Every structure is written in C-alpha cells, then in structure tokens.
Amino acid sequence: MAKFIIDAGHGGNDPGAIYNGRKESNDVLRLALRVGELLKKNGQTVLYTRESDKSVSLSERSSFENKNGCDYFVSIHRNAYQPEAAKGVETHIYSNGSSAEQLANKVNLELVNVGFVDRKVKVSNFHVLRETKNPAVLIEVGFIDNSSDNKLFDSKFEDIAQGIARGCLKQEGKELVVSNNTLDDDTYFRVICGSYKDRSNAIKQQNKLRSVGFESFLEVLHNS
C-alpha cells in the first residue's frame, strides 16, 4: 500500500487559468477528488492539499507534503497559453532519473491513450516539485483555453481520472480495479418487468409482483 498526496492546484482567491468563465481551480478539484477516490478504493492511502474551493499557498502545499510524508505527490493542473493555440497533456518533474520520472511517464501515457496530444514529460522548476521531499509530479491535463481539450476533459472525465489513478497504481506494480456495481448516492438502478398495451394486464402483473413481496408502480408512457 502506497501513500499519495493529491494536490488540486489553485483554489479560493486564486482560480488559476480562466477561459470563457471556466476556472482551472474547479476543474482540477473535481478531478483530484475523483482520482483520490479511485486510489482509496484500490487500497491506497490518500491525503489532499485541499478538498474544497479554498486558498492554499505554494509553501503550504509543500509544507503539508513534507510534514505528512508520502510515497508520491501528485499535483493536478490545467494548462493555458493563447485561445485555441495549443493543446495536449504534459507532465512535469524536477529531475530526470527518478521514481517521479517513472510515475510521470506512466500517467502521461495513460492520458495520451484517453485522446490528448502528447506534449511529453518535462523537467521544470515548479515550487511543488522543487520543495517537496518525496517524488512529485505535476500534470497539466489539457489546455483550458482550447475547446477540443475542454470537450475531451468533459466527455472523458472518468477515463481521465481512471488514467491518472491507473498510472499511479502501475508505479506500485498494481492494476486499477473499478467496480461498476454501485453508483453514487443519488443514482439508482430501476428494474422493469414488462410493458403492456392493456391496462388490466399491467395491473394483473403488478398484483402478481406484490403477492410475492415486490412493490411496484404503474407508469403510463406515450410514444412520441
């Protein structure tokens, strides 16, 4: 079991990049929480630098990592340049030849497989990479000022989250297991027993179900 600190970039009075009202801080928080959820469901320990839209300074982020310790620090961001001028995913590390580079390559490949243009793994002097004691990566999940990247981010959100989690688990020699048997608390499965043109037949079937302990309801549908 590994310990991951998941860092959702920006937040609070720092929205990060903004494009057409869309805030980087919101996108990455939602993604960070889902990645952490997947890792926890796969037996990993997860801490977050933030779990809501609040301000967390760079020094607070690195201090949190150094105080709590972890096997890997994963910072999630979205990129920006000029509207529609650049697109793709890139993952940053502080130096080559490290376990952070191994993790970065795994995660970056997973996101390329989702459909992002590959902007490769890059060495960068970012604070959260430089000032953290343990292996750290910073993922730029597409450009927030590129409409095709935003479309991919929205339509493939779960695939993106699973890709990041899968890359993290592969670094630990494990495979991601995702259960499709349960949904969130606001979603339910509905069992449909049959459709009838005659109302009396529908009621007979409803009574049969009730007689063996299955409550049911009658719904009238109209073909459009």
Put a short name on every predicted segment.
Residues 16, 101, 148-149, 201-203:
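Short acidic, gly/pro-rich beta-turn/loop elements at beta-sheet edges
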Residues 18-25, 196-199:
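Periplasmic OmpA-like peptidoglycan-binding domain that tethers envelope proteins to the cell wall
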Residues 17, 54, 190-191:
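Generic anion/oxyanion-binding catalytic loop in active/binding sites
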Residues 177-224:
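Solvent-exposed beta-strand motifs enriched in subsets of small alpha/beta binding domains
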Residues 1-2, 224:
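Short, Lys/Arg-enriched, disordered terminal segments
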Residues 2-21:
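Short glycine-rich His-centered loop
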Residues 2-4, 22-180:
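Active-site-proximal helix/loop segments of hydrolytic enzymes
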Residues 11, 79, 144, 196, ...:
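Active-site beta-loop-alpha junctions enriched in small/polar residues
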